[in-house]
């Protein structure tokens, strides 16, 4: 109540921000006459003037009013479009590193040009991130005319580009590209073996289009670069037959023993997207595997040697119980292709991880492709947080504003519409069965068709879109289908979806980024005419005029019929996706309407609200075909959606807390890798490694603070000679000396090792040997980093079970992953030193051969695959952790711990004192915990 009163007096935070921005809009508008009076050349010269002023210390904030005014004037001259005042506000929101929520049709693409132009003045690069290559190329070409006219270079970063083209794209002032490609380029840059092979500059500023889709919908799923691992294809085929021999349990057993409607061997938890074997299921599975000869007599499925079988069995069960053809994937040209859950688009080249994709291939009887080993991985959350400044645009961000603020530190500002919205959102209609629901949908579509009103029908899967298409064919209603199978015609179908009597079926929000204009998209048709070289200029002008007149007539006709009508055939688990569908109607003050038709068979209702709604229908004795249309039911559904959204947010937050641990380690390792790449001479780094290894070896035989009688000098001498090629008579030295300190003996060992090293360098020359050392270090880093990623995956898979032992899984994961990281650095340190000391090189030719061999080993990893998985193992762990523990505070000290360990590898002194608390958070002293590792 008090909050509401304060809002009435002072306005909401959003209203206050808009008020501040409107003051700046007034400044920009005041400059308009001045810039209108400039010639083209004078206006174009402003860009260089701004750059010089920025170089002399003037801030971008100070340049904003003039830069926005210049960009607006240039747009009027080049694009024939003038930025509205609300678009100026949107541009300022983007420049301030916030998220601008702008309704569909309000001109987000043009709005972005303001912030892009201003930030490109710095010369440090601006990345405009889109959801697919088509939009990246379209916007780069479309808005590139404006930027080029203003003297800025524009590049587009596409999947198909080669290395040189990518370098040129990133060197441009402005680079358009997809979120996947930017992320993969970052990972690839950290796999190169020559600094000149990197394509990206330091990450300066990014504007993310459809920011909700990229930073929220896809945030649970990491980008992965992988190479082929061991072949298990036969095992997948054999496991594929097992689910059919097991029976599914209906209902989940509760703590009081109730809840099971029909006993079985496994049950499916649709909420957590998991399959679990029951006790009887374990026994039955063991019998089946025993008969198949996959496990031995008396062996348990949980025996260490059978963990792989468990992994494959669960993959097969999930493939059969949770993933369905034409809903989660399609089979195309003998391959299983994933369907994007949120857009309905086909995701060619992407594969589910952890053996799930191979299990689905076995189920469908297509060729099973080999499993992959992860070479590099990063989540979008951690990639985009590396930019100095990040902002985004979308039509639907307000429902996720808390998550944007919590995870990314991004505030959401709702931008006012240029004209008041006219769309009518009608009450949901809920039917008992799917048949009744589809009958009502067909009636609604027929009514619109007869009145000449265009209809956009949203479905949640390809299967549903094709079912509806068949029903419309039976009803003799002409229509077009837009789903993943028609991806190529997407923009064309959407562009004409606003013509009279047009019926368009779209899977989820396929077609985002293209406006549905009432009467059809005349610009698209005019473009075809202008591109026709057989026509004269006069004929082109005449035909374009005819098209525009025809469009104006159709536009008025559609407006009179009520504008675009949106029909939703099912509620999505996220309100935001539903709002995106609704948002296609009523653009820029046009009329429009929307209604959702639901049935009690829908997944969301079945899981969260079905029993309550069914009870209401039974109590009201609703006749067949009669819907419920009441606010209380709609609110009940929205409450269910909020529950799902809250749970998904918890999963994403948990995922980030887990991934932050490996991210800190990744950043430290990549930082070290880049130092090796860029160093003129890696000699100092190798020397630090060398001294660390020999000191550790020395302390194995001569422990600190011990008596001379406790030293094993003979063993040390033998190990140095046989394992390291360092022949130093330590026993004689000790006998000849009356008394010697351990530190003096250590100095003798280090000097002897240094002499052996210098002898090797002298044989081939310092410069050549430094190149060899660089190759050895990079190979060792990359090989063991890959193994470390696999080890982290294994650790993650079972860590949530620690919750049952009253331990915090995240704290345990942080502690154990840091121990693994310490071992990784220890292994690298020892391996690099051992190779450098034991390699036998007599000449320059032999050194070149050794370097070439390393290069061959590195280039063997050419068969790389790039994946952005639909739902990763890491997300499942986070989900499991959320079930057991709930959300707990983030793991705070992992970065300092990883930094300390990496610093030790580089030979730097850790900042943590030996008696200080260990950064891992265990509560122990550093020397008694991770200090041992460094």
Curated annotation (Swiss-Prot):
It catalyses: ATP + H2O + cellular proteinSide 1 = ADP + phosphate + cellular proteinSide 2. Signal peptide: none annotated. GO terms for molecular function: ATP binding; metal ion binding; protein-exporting ATPase activity. Its EC number is 7.4.2.8. Zn(2+) binds at residues 918, 920, 929-930. Coiled coil: none annotated. PROSITE patterns: SECA, SECA_MOTOR_DEAD. It holds the Pfam family SecA_DEAD. Keywords: ATP-binding, Cell inner membrane, Cell membrane, Cytoplasm, Membrane, Metal-binding, Nucleotide-binding, Protein transport, Translocase, Translocation, Transport, Zinc. It comes from the Bacteria. The keyword Translocase applies. ATP binds at residues 87, 105-109, 515. GO terms for cellular component: cell envelope Sec protein transport complex; cytosol; plasma membrane. Monomer and homodimer. Part of the essential Sec protein translocation apparatus which comprises SecA, SecYEG and auxiliary proteins SecDF-YajC and YidC. NCBIfam families: PRK12904.1, secA. Part of the Sec protein translocase complex. Interacts with the SecYEG preprotein conducting channel. Has a central role in coupling the hydrolysis of ATP to the transfer of proteins into and across the cell membrane, serving both as a receptor for the preprotein-SecB complex and as an ATP-driven molecular motor driving the stepwise translocation of polypeptide chains across the membrane. This is Protein translocase subunit SecA. It comes from Ralstonia pickettii (strain 12J). The lineage of its organism: Bacteria, Pseudomonadati, Pseudomonadota, Betaproteobacteria, Burkholderiales. The gene is secA.
